[in-house]
Amino acid sequence: MQLNSNEISKLIKRRIAQFDITCEIRNEGTITAVGDGVIHIHGLTNVMQGEMIALPSDQFAVALNLERDSVGAVVMGSYLNLSEGMVAKCTGNILRVPVGTALLGRVVNALGVPVDNKGVIQCSCYFPVEAVAPSVIDRKSIDEPIQTGYKSVDSMIPIGRGQRELIIGDRQTGKSALAIDAIINQRYSGVKCIYVAVGQKATTVANVVKKLEEHRALSNTIVVIASASESAVLQYLAPYSGCAMGEYFRDLGEDALIVYDDLSKQAIAYRQISLLLRRPPGREAYPGDIFYLHSRLLERASRVSSDYVERCTHGKITGRTGSLTAIPIVETQAGDVSSFIPTNVISITDGQIFLESHLFNSGIRPAVNPGISVSRVGGSAQTNIMKVLSGGIRTALAQYRELAAFSQFASELDDVTRKQLQHGQKVTELLKQKQYAPMAVSCQSIILFAAVHGYLEDVEVSKISDFESALILYMTYTEKELIKIIDHDGVYNIDIENKFKSILETFKSNQSW
């Protein structure tokens, strides 16, 4: 058989023309060191801060240290199956978590993966865990209250929608209880809630979830958990993940409330990560950017303008403002609020509620110290009726504390001083409240009215609690229409004042308590 060179040439040219070489450019590196959840990768280029890095066995790491010739990253999950020499690849993606209404009523980890055995969460929307806070132009002034249901907080330390209000105190002083009751009080208000548990025992969080379910508040709440048994990176990321979930509702023109319980443990987790990444330690061995850790998180809580909401929804929602209210919790040691993390967070937030051990142990619960607790938003975040009636409460308590200090050294007291001391004791007793029993504005209002207008003068201190319970019960059954008006409008006028006087006079004439 004779071969034709022309045919062979044509065949080769046709095969060359049909030959398809696909080029795949990958940014790969080699793991050079593994230990304590931290890996160092050599050879990666153009890596972003916070970028997801793909590892063998479908694992991921987050790039935190960008050095000249290597990348330091923290592994999300177990690092025990990783070893030197393995390949790591850039993904080009920043860490994102699922957001949306499908998460309400669920318990998820720091990555948005459900851990409550209720099935997979179907989410079509994902938000980055790190986001830029709304600018000054995009924000709106805070003028709407978020009711906690506590008389002492709503009257003296009001919290507004879009505010950052710190709860600070020693362990076992009722910090979490106050925040959880604030969530329970939102069950009928339409405010979406996110509870972020960082570094807590899983059994403690399970009890919180159970209580939220019992009080019909879980269906309106997302619980994000990074328990004490989980890695430091998940404890560090959990508050940012919860914040992203809250921003979804804020950007839709809705109101959301997020509780960070607590940021002290997040700071400890971040310190652990930073030391493992060989970052230079500073005060109390915390890294130099520990302030930025909390400031960039808490600055994302805000009340945004209707223009911002319209821009975020591409014109689908107009004329509505959104808000994300943050209640961070910080634990102190022996009441020392001048240590590093407490002073940082105090300087970032718009006020703080101090809870004190000696008040808690003496039976005053919530153990709020009204002298050093403050809300920088103040009366602009209160309803009209609470603003009018609460002024006398703070004054009465301030006078009581001052006189109580001097009365210890005085052998005899005049009648005026004795009356002021008795009034202060009654107001202190009146502000006590049981856990899981948040109170509506209407009920708080008539109790404060009774205290301010002298209706407690003939009531003994030991009978204050019974007087309060009986008064609320009486008002609930006899004045349903008035309760609706006050809870809806929050106005205070001469008609409501006369109505309150009539209710109290009729109630006291019955002596039903």
Curated annotation (Swiss-Prot):
It is a peripheral membrane protein. It is found in: Cell inner membrane. It comes from the Bacteria. Its main location: membrane. Its EC number is 7.1.2.2. Gene3D superfamilies: 2.40.30.20, ATP synthase alpha/beta chain, C-terminal domain, P-loop containing nucleotide triphosphate hydrolases. It catalyses: ATP + H2O + 4 H(+)(in) = ADP + phosphate + 5 H(+)(out). ATP binds at residues 169-176. Keywords: ATP synthesis, ATP-binding, Cell inner membrane, Cell membrane, CF(1), Hydrogen ion transport, Ion transport, Membrane, Nucleotide-binding, Translocase, Transport. GO terms for molecular function: ADP binding; ATP binding; proton-transporting ATP synthase activity, rotational mechanism. One of its GO terms (cellular component) is proton-transporting ATP synthase complex. Transmembrane segments: none annotated. The record marks 373 as: Required for activity. It holds the Pfam family ATP-synt_ab_C. InterPro entries: ATP_synth_asu-like_sf, ATP_synth_asu_C, ATP_synth_asu_C_sf, ATP_synth_F1_a_nt-bd_dom, ATP_synth_F1_asu, ATPase_a/bsu_AS, ATPase_F1/V1/A1_a/bsu_N, ATPase_F1/V1/A1_a/bsu_N_sf. HAMAP family: ATP_synth_alpha_bact. Belongs to the ATPase alpha/beta chains family. Produces ATP from ADP in the presence of a proton gradient across the membrane. The alpha chain is a regulatory subunit. F-type ATPases have 2 components, CF(1) - the catalytic core - and CF(0) - the membrane proton channel. CF(1) has five subunits: alpha(3), beta(3), gamma(1), delta(1), epsilon(1). CF(0) has three main subunits: a(1), b(2) and c(9-12). The alpha and beta chains form an alternating ring which encloses part of the gamma chain. CF(1) is attached to CF(0) by a central stalk formed by the gamma and epsilon chains, while a peripheral stalk is formed by the delta and b chains. This is ATP synthase subunit alpha.
